[in-house]
Curated annotation (Swiss-Prot):
Pfam families: BCLP (PF12304). This is Keratinocyte-associated protein 3. The keyword Membrane applies. Belongs to the TMEM54 family. It comes from the Eukaryota. Expressed in skin, pancreas and keratinocytes. The keyword Glycoprotein does not apply. The gene is KRTCAP3. It is found in: Membrane. It comes from Homo sapiens.
Length: 240
């Protein structure tokens, strides 16, 4: 039976790949959080109307992106722990649950951001400033003219460009989070031997690798202790 090409986790290179994916998720999650914070501080806080309602673009671009970024960091940390503890089933199940939730959230975030970008491009950014410019829903009226322009606390001509400049990288980050979370799901299923990615003998190979790594770690620790003792003795002789 031919295995799916997505089931690429093996005993030789799988743990190192999982560690790299965890580090990438932590990095991408922090970048997405930063983009969401900058987007809120520079653009989207201006488009909240006085009644407390917000535009759909705000909800899609800020709330979901921030949630996806936070969860991506958590999945990355669990992936790092799982890559160093390959024989602990609870970590595998936690990784599977968090990665699956983050996969769905990242896909929803990507689709929402794509919708927000499409709507904003289609109406030329007028939907973003509709509360500040009630009369500018007419595409024939320039953004820097029309009723309500003098009451705006920000420059309406920069809202459109700034929003797109931050939304598009956030969209790419969300797509990357979805792909990395999908790999974590595959790795967790493979480690547990569940689904089409099940590999016979994988647990035995991992146990052998763990047994081989333990003497090496102990040998390295002993060598470090010997080096430290030699340095201490050399320093004592120099003082004498």
């Amino acid at each position: 039976m031919r295995r799916c090409s997505l089931c690429a986790f093996d005993a030789a290179r799988g743990p190192r790949r999982l560690m790299r994916v965890g580090l990438a998720l932590i990095l991408v999650g922090h970048v997405n959080l930063l983009l969401g914070a900058v987007l809120h501080g520079t653009v989207l806080r201006h488009v909240a109307n006085p009644r407390g309602a917000v535009t759909p673009e705000y909800t899609v671009a800020n709330v979901i992106s921030v949630g996806s970024g936070l969860l991506s960091v958590s999945v990355g940390l669990v992936a790092l722990l799982a890559s160093r503890n390959l024989l602990r089933p609870p970590l595998h199940w936690v990784l599977l649950a968090l990665a699956l939730v983050n996969l769905l959230l990242s896909v929803a975030c990507s689709l929402g951001l794509l919708l927000a970008v499409s709507l904003t491009v289609a109406n030329g950014g007028r939907r973003l400033i509709a509360d500040c410019h009630p009369g500018l829903l007419d595409p024939l009226v320039p953004l820097d003219e029309g009723p309500g322009h003098t009451d705006c606390p920000f420059d309406p001509t920069r809202i459109y460009d700034t929003a797109l400049a931050l939304w598009i990288p956030s969209l790419l980050m969300s797509a990357g989070e979805a792909a990395l979370s999908g790999y974590c799901c595959v790795a967790a299923l493979t480690l547990r031997g569940v689904g089409p990615c099940r590999k016979d003998g994988l647990q035995g190979q991992l146990e052998e690798m763990t047994e081989l790594e333990s003497p090496k770690c102990k040998r390295q620790e002993n060598e470090q202790l010997l080096d430290q003792n030699q340095e201490i003795r050399a320093s004592q002789r120099s003082w004498v």
